[in-house]
Every structure is written in structure tokens, then in C-alpha cells.
């Protein structure tokens, strides 16, 4: 009897491992068209972020939730657009323009991602003060509800706080 239980456990573990491997190898795309752009590129050794890539199974899981986000705000008359994600296509070009025109960030390598009116900053800066200044600058852009600051000082790969491009 114990051999049977062991065999079942081995089969279950193998099935889980096979499923995880299949998901890891599944093609991943920016299925939701989340805006993801490089804003500056002064530090060529800066680790490149992966960006918003999803496997087909993840897209199916997230589609309903993403379709609903921001609907109650719109119905109450507090929001201009019926879905939080619809703002991102407008916000990210304004963020890019603002950061490029500012002049304080020309010595950085920065990528920005827009998801649900939240702007995620990824890349490399010269100092912690510069990272804070970048975050504060992005908070000033119209329609931005928040900023996720994943910037790192310098270009060391081991200091990266975001998934890297493959």
C-alpha cells in the first residue's frame, strides 16, 4: 500500500512539474497592450526590464478583473473613462515627454510601464535622490494615481528589483 501512495505522489509531482515547465515555455505577449517604453538611455549597461508579458493562461485569468477595474468610479461620475486601464495609453506618453523635457534625468536609463493609472519606474539612476526626484516628477503628471519605484542606483544586475528581459 505504501508503494502505491509513493507512486501516486511521484505522478502528482511530475504532473505539477510538467505543467510549470509548459507555462514557463509558453509564448508570452503583451496581450493587454500595457504601455511600456524606454524614456532615457544614458546607461547602456543598465539591466533591461522584461515588460508586461503574459502567457495565454494568465491572460484568461486576468481578463475579467481587468475589464471591471474602474467601472464603479465611472458609473459614479468620478472618472472620465469607464476602465482604469484606458488611461494608460494617454498617461505614459505624457510621462515620457515630461521626464525628457525636465532635463534632470538625461544621465539615466529609465523604462516606464502603465497599468491601471499606476506608473512603474524601472531602470538605473545615478543616486537615491535622483530616484526620489523621478518618482515625485511622475506623480505630478495628470491622471497618475500612484508610482511604483523600482529604480536602482548604478547598473549592477544583482541590485535589480524587476524581472529582466530574456
Where are the regions a protein language model picked out?
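N-terminal targeting leaders
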Residues: 2-166
Amino acid at each position: 500500500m505504501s508503494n502505491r501512495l509513493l507512486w501516486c505522489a511521484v505522478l502528482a509531482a511530475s504532473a505539477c512539474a510538467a505543467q510549470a515547465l509548459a507555462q514557463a515555455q509558453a509564448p508570452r505577449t503583451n496581450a493587454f497592450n500595457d504601455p511600456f517604453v524606454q524614456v532615457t538611455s544614458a546607461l547602456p549597461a543598465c539591466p533591461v526590464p522584461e515588460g508586461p508579458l503574459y502567457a495565454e493562461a494568465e491572460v484568461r485569468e486576468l481578463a475579467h478583473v481587468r475589464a471591471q477595474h474602474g467601472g464603479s468610479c465611472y458609473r459614479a461620475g468620478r472618472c472620465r473613462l469607464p476602465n482604469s486601464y484606458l488611461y494608460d495609453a494617454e498617461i505614459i506618453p505624457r510621462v515620457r515627454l515630461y521626464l525628457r523635457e525636465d532635463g534632470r534625468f538625461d544621465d539615466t536609463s529609465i523604462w516606464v510601464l502603465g497599468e491601471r493609472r499606476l506608473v512603474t519606474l524601472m531602470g538605473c539612476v545615478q543616486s537615491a535622490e535622483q530616484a526620489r526626484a523621478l518618482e515625485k516628477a511622475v506623480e505630478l503628471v495628470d491622471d497618475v494615481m500612484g508610482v511604483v519605484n523600482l529604480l536602482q542606483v548604478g547598473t549592477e544586475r544583482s541590485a535589480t528589483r524587476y524581472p529582466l528581459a530574456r
